[in-house]
């Protein structure tokens, strides 16, 4: 907006007769509009340093080539002023248009075979996202749904209320906007269910498989039952409520997910042969279940203990979040009055605030949070939905007193040093304020009830918490597992599914049963097609309700980055990173770094999803011996006479390579490095 408005001011002053060379934010989004004003030439720089930047020049040139404005001899001031005004409000010029999320895989950058789909690694169940999106784009909805069911027991539920970490880590964020992956999952179920159900067969149970008891029929318990039954285990779910669904059914408001979709997933779990016992004995213990013949016991009772808040003043309308939400879902909302405060800023607080606004008689709801908006734990989407509904937010405030006359005294806070989770600590100030409230809902401090676990027979450590393996969820009592929020603390639905899956995998390993998760063997799109997608920007997105067009658009936008990435190659201004095809590796290409071309600008590291720097971590070709000596990069230098100097993992080796590009006496640890070296040197000698 700044550059185009400067151009407008100058053109107005010179009546359009001042020749202007434009450089400052020209991109696929506006280059045609800029050209139509008569500005010549238009130069682009920043966009070239982004993934797909060079490839996008083709689209830009096509747009300009089709223009009728080639004959303009001066700037059209009216058009330019209109464009300048438009630039101030266009979506792509607004700060919120570009997500602040950084695509991250976690872990160091591998020397070879680094192609990865960040959406998959971010997903708690490692859903095969690029594969099922490709199948949907081909119209294979049944196959796509079958693929989803391999890792996800509850696609109807997660199609609505998944926290979609996949979208926050979609590679498209570096191009335009992330794929709407959660909505695609919903479409896969809508269009694939009837065909999938027609060819689905109930798993055949086996008399030699040990029975499993699952306490709790929430998302974690349902998922454990699904995966265990699919492998042939007899499973019984014990639930204290009158029906299954847990927090999704009884706590999350129905305006977020229709009840029939929750029931869809429950019914399909039951169709696998899982038995349900509702209204079970609250005093059910592990010992009692063992006595009934259950070899394995899974405990998925959630984290619904809420300590509430201790406030002076004695007001009697102070409710705990789960109590309020349960009453709301039953159609029996608690008395709130007109003005309601919700304490906390997590996802449960957002549900409470939005639900409270729908209670008859409530005129306004205010969320009170002791940190700033940046530190709030609620998912961004849920926060924005609350804002859209009209929920007010008071950040950096903490309640201290709630008097019977409705006066709520809050202390203003400031942010101090970061805590162990990286969020800045709230520090009290001397300033207080008074608000007028009729009711207060506390949505803080949900945690597992360790006393209940102890009564069940779950061993607790000296700190009062269960002794549990963080990966499998197995307690110090063999074959007894904690799954879902009771193991991890308050988390997401898909996190509960993933935790249940890991626990089931350990049981299957002990039972010598092959995992039900099979590697996906689908044919990826060709590299030429994927490169075309890299050069394509979605200026406008199709409405998700136009299902055919929506699926086609998103399938075309998917970059299939586990089959082809090379972002570090795309964004290097000096072309110091190159992709070469080397036989014998998983990925189509391996990345080589050319030391002589690199000025260490770090642009490749900026866009790499790994916690690494391609210009330092990839196999590096050195042109001079002194460059090799002055670097720590893994790589090689080939001297005259076939002497080969190689460095890997900080160790330097002196080897020789013959005329057939065979490296002699190379240690086994250098296998991948030597394969690349032999291929490159052999190619150079052809």
Regions found by a protein language model. Give the residues of each.
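Iron-sulfur cluster-binding cysteine motifs and their immediate structural context
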Residues: 113, 117-138, 159-189, 236, ...
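Conserved small/polar residues in nucleotide/adenosyl-binding loops
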Residues: 684-686
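A conserved FAD-binding loop/helix module that cradles the flavin
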Residues: 483-511
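Beta1-alpha1 glycine-rich phosphate/pyrophosphate-binding loop at the start
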Residues: 127-137, 145, 174, 178-182, ...
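FAD-site-proximal beta/loop scaffold in flavoenzymes
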Residues: 316-337, 420-490
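C-terminal helical cap(s) of enzyme catalytic domains, especially alpha/beta-barrels
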Residues: 50-74
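Glycine-rich dinucleotide-binding loop and its adjacent helix/turn
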Residues: 189-205, 264-279, 306-360, 462-471, ...
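Ferredoxin-like iron-sulfur electron-transfer modules
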Residues: 99-122, 143-164, 196-213, 249-250, ...
């Amino acid at each position: 907006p700044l550059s185009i408005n400067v151009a407008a001011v100058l053109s107005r002053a010179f009546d359009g007769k001042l020749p202007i060379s434009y450089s400052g934010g020209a991109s696929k989004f506006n280059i045609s509009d800029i050209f139509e004003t008569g500005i010549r030439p238009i130069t682009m720089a920043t966009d070239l340093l982004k993934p797909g930047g060079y490839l996008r020049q083709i689209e830009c040139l096509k747009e300009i080539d089709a223009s009728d404005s080639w004959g303009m001899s001066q700037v059209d001031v009216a058009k330019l002023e209109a464009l300048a005004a438009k630039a101030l409000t266009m979506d792509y010029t607004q700060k919120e248009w570009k997500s602040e999320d950084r695509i991250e895989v976690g872990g160091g950058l591998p020397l070879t075979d680094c192609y990865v789909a960040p959406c998959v690694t971010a997903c708690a169940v490692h859903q095969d996202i690029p594969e099922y999106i490709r199948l949907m784009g081909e119209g294979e909805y049944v196959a796509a749904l079958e693929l989803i069911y391999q890792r996800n027991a509850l696609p109807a539920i997660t199609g609505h209320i998944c926290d979609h970490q996949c979208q926050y880590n979609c590679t498209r964020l570096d191009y335009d906007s992330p794929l709407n992956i959660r909505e695609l999952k919903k479409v896969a179920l809508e269009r694939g269910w009837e065909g999938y159900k027609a060819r689905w067969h109930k798993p055949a149970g086996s008399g030699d498989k040990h029975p499993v008891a699952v306490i709790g029929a929430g998302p974690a318990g349902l998922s454990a039952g699904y995966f265990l039954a699919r492998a042939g285990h007899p499973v019984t779910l014990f639930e204290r409520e009158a029906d299954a669904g847990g927090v999704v059914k009884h706590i999350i408001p129905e305006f977020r997910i229709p009840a029939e979709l929750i029931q869809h997933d429950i019914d399909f779990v039951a169709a696998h042969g899982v038995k349900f016992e509702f209204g079970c004995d609250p005093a059910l213990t592990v010992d009692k279940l063992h006595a009934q013949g259950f070899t394995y016991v899974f405990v998925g009772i959630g984290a619904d203990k809420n300590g509430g808040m201790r406030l002076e003043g004695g007001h009697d309308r102070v409710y705990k979040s789960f109590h309020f939400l349960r009453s709301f879902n039953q159609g029996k909302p608690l008395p709130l009055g007109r003005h309601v405060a919700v304490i906390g800023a997590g996802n449960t607080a957002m549900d409470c605030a939005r639900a409270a606004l729908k209670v008859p008689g409530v005129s306004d709801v205010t969320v009170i949070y002791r940190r700033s908006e940046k530190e709030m734990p609620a998912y961004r989407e849920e926060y924005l939905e609350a804002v859209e509904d009209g929920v007010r937010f008071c950040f950096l405030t903490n309640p201290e007193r709630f008097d019977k006359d409705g006066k709520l005294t809050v202390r203003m806070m400031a942010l101090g040093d970061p805590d162990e989770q990286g969020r800045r600590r709230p520090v009290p100030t001397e300033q207080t304020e008074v608000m007028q409230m009729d009711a207060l809902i506390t949505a803080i401090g949900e945690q597992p009830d360790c006393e209940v676990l102890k009564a069940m027979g779950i061993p607790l450590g000296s700190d009062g918490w269960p002794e549990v393996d963080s990966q499998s969820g197995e307690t110090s009592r063999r074959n007894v597992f904690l799954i879902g929020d009771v193991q991890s603390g308050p988390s997401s639905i898909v996190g509960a599914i993933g935790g249940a899956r890991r626990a089931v995998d350990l049981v299957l390993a002990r039972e010598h049963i092959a995992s039900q998760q099979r590697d996906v063997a689908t044919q990826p799109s060709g590299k030429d097609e994927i490169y075309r997608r890299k050069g394509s920007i979605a200026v406008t997105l199709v409405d998700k309700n136009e299902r055919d067009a929506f699926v086609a658009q998103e399938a075309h936008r998917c970059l299939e980055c586990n089959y082809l990435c090379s972002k570090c190659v795309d964004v290097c201004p000096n072309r110091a990173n190159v992709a070469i095809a080397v036989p014998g590796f998983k990925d189509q290409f391996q990345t080589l770094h050319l030391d002589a071309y690199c000025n260490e600008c770090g642009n490749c590291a900026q866009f790499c999803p790994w916690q690494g720097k391609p210009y330092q971590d990839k196999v590096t070709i050195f042109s001079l011996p002194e460059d090799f000596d002055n670097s720590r990069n893994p790589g090689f230098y080939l001297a005259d006479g076939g002497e080969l100097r190689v460095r890997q993992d900080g160790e330097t080796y002196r080897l020789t390579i013959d005329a057939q590009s065979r490296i002699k006496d190379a240690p086994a640890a250098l296998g991948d490095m030597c394969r690349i070296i032999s291929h490159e040197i052999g190619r150079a000698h052809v």
